[in-house]
Every structure is written in structure tokens, then in C-alpha cells.
Amino acid sequence: MPNVDDIRIFHGSANPSLAENVAKELNTTIGNALISRFSDGEIRFEIEENVRGRDIYLIQSTGHPTNEHVMELILMGDAFRRASAASITAVVPYFGYARQDRRVRSSRVPISAKVVADMMQKVGFSRLITVDLHADQIQGFFYMPVDNIYASITALEEYRLLDKLETPMIVSPDVGGVVRARAIAKRLNDSDLAIIDKRRPAPNQAEVMNVIGNVQNRHCVIVDDIVDTAGTLCHAASALKEKGALTVSSYCTHPVLSGNAVKNIMDSDIDELIVTDTIPLHEEAAKCRKITQISLSRLIAETISRINQKESVSSMFLD
């Protein structure tokens, strides 16, 4: 990848290893900055180099602890604006609060994704780069440009999962994920598609009801954007095995893996879970033999390079 001289890469505390790998792909280094905490827990951030007139790319996922990482992002953005950076691009591989993107019927709740978008714009971010945004329409909450990287296809192609399977079938874990699953199936050798029809009786609980499609003697690959408690995946895997699937693998971009997720995965019919490094794996997940993590550093670096060189980003994902 060509050297990009006029940009600077910085990061918060959410995912420094990903930021370092992105910088290496761009043949550059991480900018000098201090991020720490005051004695009362408030965030302290200071830029330790001249960034006047520079194009800043600030890499910061907003996963657990979500509120801490969101606040870091906001304060860092304000610091770069006050330091007269020419542009400030927020590179947020995992966009926290994305699942709170609408009011459900008459619920008296905030639209939290919109609140985060408003804060980012208020402090002066110029652009957002994110990965497999939970809902594409969240881009409409922003007045600034948003580049949503579609990582699923690239990640599965690089891992060559489908090449290892003789009769693969892409599976959507719910009706809402059909568009994503269909796009992946089309790009990956026009693989067949199955759908899990499920009902969710309570938050963070999923009950599989029906499998739409013949999965008998097939190697199934469930694709989703987020794996949180893993309830959806585990129920889906059981349903697929009951219908005669030979193996069940899964690809999920964002490994939130909260609560008993790792235990649920180990005790389930899932043979392998492939995730990316948009969120660092905690210790239990990193040791889990069923979980494989692949890096998106090259894809993110390519996106940054294209933006910097004023080249198309969308062409990376077109047939």
C-alpha cells in the first residue's frame, strides 16, 4: 500500500492493536497523544504533536465499556478541532448504540444512535468510517459523509471458509438479516440461502421457530453483524442440526460476546465462529477453541488510503 504522508493516525483506548496494524498497512506510525484518567475518573486527552492542517484519522470502536469509549471519542474529536486539524475522520469499526436506532411503536425511549451522531457532529468530525453498520439507515442520522465498510464478504473470502466446504449454504439468523445474507451468498459463488424464522420473547433472548430452506446434508454458514449473548446463533445452530445440517459455522463481524456468550458457544452445536478485530477479544473468548478472529486492518487501511487519494470506496464492494 502506498505511503500516505499527509495523514496522521491516532487512537483511543478501545482498540490500540487494530490502530497499530492499520498504521503499519499505511506505512506510517501512530501519532503522539496522551490518554489517561484523572483521579476522579474523568478522561484526560492531550495531543503531543503539531496537527495544524493535517488530515486526522481517529480509530476508536465504541464497544464495552461503551460509555467510556464514546466519551473518549467525543473529547478527542474536540481536541483535534481546537488544534486546527484540516479534517477529522472518526474511524469507528464497531459503532456502539447502533441497535438503538428507532422508537419501538409508542415506547418512551431515546433514539440513542441519533444522539451519538449529533454529539460527533457537534464536536467537529468531518467524516465517519464504520464497519458493517447494524442498520444502513443510521447513515441518515449524519450530515457528514459516512463510509460503511462491508466487511463480511471480504473477511469470508480471505478466510476461504467456503472453499473448505463441499456443499456450503449461507444462512440468515433472522428475517431482518436476509438482505445481508443474500448479498454474501451472491458474491460467494452464488451459494444457496436459508433463513431462520425466529421470535424473540424478551430482550437478549431468541427462540428459533422454523428453518426456511432445505439444509439436509449441507455445510451451513450463519452470517450476522453482531454476536452478543450468542443466543440467536446457538438456537439457530441447533435448529439447523435438527434439520440435518452436517456442520454449522458462523461469521459475525463484531464480537461483543457479553455475559455467558463464550460458554453458550462452547455448549452449542456451532462448530466454528469467525469474528473480526473490530472489538478486541476478552481473555475467555481468546482462549475459546471454537472462536477464530481475523483482522480487518488491511481493509480499513485501504479505505483510508482511498479517501485520502480521493478514490472511490464503494467500488471495493461492487461486483
Swiss-Prot record:
Q: Name one GO molecular function term.
A: magnesium ion binding
Q: Which residues form the active site?
A: K198
The UniProt record lists the keyword Kinase: yes
Cofactor(s) recorded for this entry are: Mg(2+)
Name one process (GO BP) from the record: ribonucleoside monophosphate biosynthetic process
Co-factor note (free text)? Binds 2 Mg(2+) ions per subunit.
Report the superkingdom from the record. Answer: Bacteria
Q: Which residues bind ATP?
A: D40, G41, E42, R99, Q100
Q: In which pathway does it act?
A: Metabolic intermediate biosynthesis; 5-phospho-alpha-D-ribose 1-diphosphate biosynthesis; 5-phospho-alpha-D-ribose 1-diphosphate from D-ribose 5-phosphate (route I): step 1/1
Membership in a protein family: Belongs to the ribose-phosphate pyrophosphokinase family. Class I subfamily.
List, alphabetically, the HAMAP family matched: RibP_PPkinase_B
This protein is called what? Ribose-phosphate pyrophosphokinase
> Which organism's genome codes for this protein?
Coxiella burnetii (strain RSA 493 / Nine Mile phase I)
Q: What taxonomic classification does the UniProt entry list for its organism?
A: Bacteria, Pseudomonadati, Pseudomonadota, Gammaproteobacteria, Legionellales
